[in-house]
Amino acid sequence: MARYLVLAVALLLAACSSTQKKPLADDPFYAPVYPEAPPTKIAATGSIYQDSQASSLYSDIRAHKVGDIITIVLKESTQAKKSAGNQIKKGSDMSLDPIFAGGSNVSIGGVPIDLRYKDSMNTKRESDADQSNSLDGSISANVMQVLNNGSLVIRGEKWISINNGDEFIRVTGLVRSQDIKPDNTIDSTRMANARIQYSGTGTFADAQKVGWLSQFFMSDWWPF
């Protein structure tokens, strides 16, 4: 019996444990893309000025091709609130008046037959959930792909090493070239299919995780 009990506890602990892999700083999915341009042949003219290395004072510095860098200004703010409630009432009432027969009450053992029954049930449940988050900052990302309509697929990450762990920001999404500002920045709210992840690894991050016992009480395995 004890063997089956230990096996059941082990299965519950395995079900409550998290299987999410820890993020890696060198994830190839977020590896930068470097533009591969063919070498430009520079003709020897004897002059210091070269047309191939010149740039116009009025040229557009905004990202527009694969390998370019763009800065995303994080301006994320979310707030969600949900409340629910229900109330169930149920009641029943039944009575049986004394029975008269022959001008007198029918009794059993001298006790008149008189039956009364009353039952009631009242169940009330309420739940509230309120959550708000905000994220401000900036991160530079690479242009990974240029679509036919001119939209840019961007992706990038930033890792910051602190005493007892690392913090990282990862971002990926789709932006329109028209939404990029002249200083080569774009607000995160202008990104489509945005995936923004801000988290950490190490001692501080592990301290914020919920323990296995608390996970069990909050999981579907808890019967109450």
UniProtKB/Swiss-Prot annotation:
Keyword Magnesium belongs to the record: no
Leader peptide range in chain numbering: 1-15
GO function term, MF aspect, one: cytoskeletal motor activity
Gene (name only): flgH
Membrane topology: Lipid-anchor
PANTHER family: FLAGELLAR L-RING PROTEIN (PTHR34933:SF1)
Entry protein name: Flagellar L-ring protein
Cell compartments where the protein resides: Cell outer membrane; Bacterial flagellum basal body
Organism name: Shewanella baltica (strain OS195)
Covalent lipidation (S-diacylglycerol cysteine), chain numbering: C16
Job of this protein: Assembles around the rod to form the L-ring and probably protects the motor/basal body from shearing forces during rotation.
Broad class of the protein's primary localization: membrane
